[in-house]
Swiss-Prot record:
The protein's annotated pathway: Carbohydrate degradation; glycolysis; pyruvate from D-glyceraldehyde 3-phosphate: step 1/5
GO-annotated biological processes: glycolytic process; lysine biosynthetic process via diaminopimelate
Record organism: Aeropyrum pernix (strain ATCC 700893 / DSM 11879 / JCM 9820 / NBRC 100138 / K1)
Catalyses which reaction(s): D-glyceraldehyde 3-phosphate + phosphate + NADP(+) = (2R)-3-phospho-glyceroyl phosphate + NADPH + H(+); D-glyceraldehyde 3-phosphate + phosphate + NAD(+) = (2R)-3-phospho-glyceroyl phosphate + NADH + H(+)
Alphabetical list of Gene3D superfamilies matching this protein: Dihydrodipicolinate Reductase, domain 2, NAD(P)-binding Rossmann-like Domain
Location within or outside the cell: Cytoplasm
InterPro entries referenced in this protein's UniProt entry, alphabetically: DapB_N (IPR000846), GlycerAld/Erythrose_P_DH (IPR020831), GlycerAld_3-P_DH_AS (IPR020830), GlycerAld_3-P_DH_cat (IPR020829), GlycerAld_3-P_DH_NAD(P)-bd (IPR020828), Glyceraldehyde-3-P_DH_2_arc (IPR006436), NAD(P)-bd_dom_sf (IPR036291)
SUPFAM superfamilies referenced in this protein's UniProt entry, alphabetically: Glyceraldehyde-3-phosphate dehydrogenase-like, C-terminal domain, NAD(P)-binding Rossmann-fold domains
Entry's family note: Belongs to the glyceraldehyde-3-phosphate dehydrogenase family.
Positions with a binding annotation for NAD(+): 13-14, 112, 170, 303
Name by which UniProt lists this protein: Glyceraldehyde-3-phosphate dehydrogenase
Quaternary organization: Homotetramer.
């Protein structure tokens, strides 16, 4: 099996997780990561033996002063890789694109970028095979990834005609000390539908979907209430069986575990998972309600880690990997430890 050489531009919440995930793949090699600031994350990368590059030679001076070895600049990294994963702050990826194209590398962008940055938006369970061979892909946002995992799973089994969803979004990631809110529930945005419906349609353009969102003062996870209209009547048992057997979806029983909140999910993950990451979509089992063709449920999205598996699959897709959908799911999920329970 040929090995794809990958560079990660950005070592923040998503970038660091994607970089570490790459090191666990048999068909990929992490050539290096790009860091702008010689902070604790850079020290961690250095301690793990991850080659560090800087945007330009100017930033390298500060790294060297702190004893952090620098392997070169972003341009030099691009000359050594087949694929670059752009995990820079929102909007920066579009600014970086000309540099990537000049270097002739395939690109994987994040959901904070506008869809136009890439040839297609990407979600593994929805369009992995169709995305193979693209020059660039945009992995949709954490919320959209959660919605698409659910929608494409149920659509494959029953057909989905329409979706209505209310998203309760975390206000900030744990390390984002300058974001909020800290004592408010904020319409995010105040207009309807929210951008999440538009984002879903970049992958499923045929879908009738409307979304609304608010931001709340928590850092743990997002929570969605989703109502789906299916193509045919179903029984609750059928829906639960489908979700229980689907990849990257975890059913959590509040009755069996006592878990009724995002904070309890994270607390449980702290007992058994590195960084308390939950890359699976969590569906609360008792919340699943079925009435003919209508399915309602609550689901939770760990915004720091849910897109990591999709990034790995997107790398394979742009690199024209010979792995099928089932094979990439097995390789990615097995290496990252995705499973059906928190423990």
């Amino acid at each position: 099996m040929s090995v794809v050489k990958v560079g990660v531009n950005g070592f923040g919440t998503i970038g660091r997780r994607v970089a570490l995930a790459i090191t666990l793949q048999k068909d990929m090699k992490l050539v290096g990561v790009v860091k702008r600031t010689p902070d604790y994350a850079a020290l961690y990368a250095a301690s793990r033996g991850i080659p560090i590059y800087t945007p330009t030679a100017k930033e390298a001076e500060e790294f060297e002063k702190r004893g952090i070895k620098v392997g070169g600049t972003l341009r030099e990294l691009l000359a050594r890789v087949d694929v670059v994963v752009d995990a820079t702050p929102e909007g920066q990826g579009a600014k970086n694109k000309p540099l990537y194209r000049e270097a002739g590398v395939k690109q994987v962008y994040q959901g904070g970028e506008k869809p136009e940055v890439a040839e297609a938006s990407f979600s593994t369970l929805c369009n992995y095979e169709e995305s193979k061979g693209r020059g660039s892909l945009r992995v949709v946002s954490c919320n959209t990834t959660g919605l698409l995992r659910l929608i494409c799973t149920l659509n494959r089994e029953f057909g989905v005609e329409s979706v209505r969803a209310v998203l309760v979004r975390r206000g900030a990631d744990p390390k984002e000390v300058k974001k909020g809110p800290i004592d408010s529930i904020v319409l995010n945005p105040p207009t309807l539908p929210s951008h999440h419906a538009v984002d879903v349609r970049t992958v499923l353009p045929w879908l009738d979907i409307k979304t609304a969102a608010v931001a709340v003062p928590t850092t743990f996870m997002h929570m969605h209430h989703v109502t789906l209209k299916l193509a045919k009547p179903v029984e609750k048992r059928e829906v639960l069986e489908t979700l229980a057997s689907a990849p990257r979806i975890m059913l959590v029983s509040s009755g069996d575990t006592g878990i009724k909140s995002t904070s309890q999910l994270v607390d449980a993950a702290r007992l058994s998972r590195m960084g308390y990451d939950i890359p699976e979509l969590v569906v609360f089992e008792e919340s699943v309600a079925v009435d003919g063709r209508e399915v309602m449920l609550f689901q939770a999205v760990h915004q720091e880690s849910i897109v990591v598996p999709e990034n790995i699959d997107a790398i394979r897709a742009v690199a024209s990997s010979p792995l099928t959908l089932d094979e990439t799911l097995k390789a990615t999920d097995g290496s990252l430890g995705l499973r059906k329970t928190l423990w």
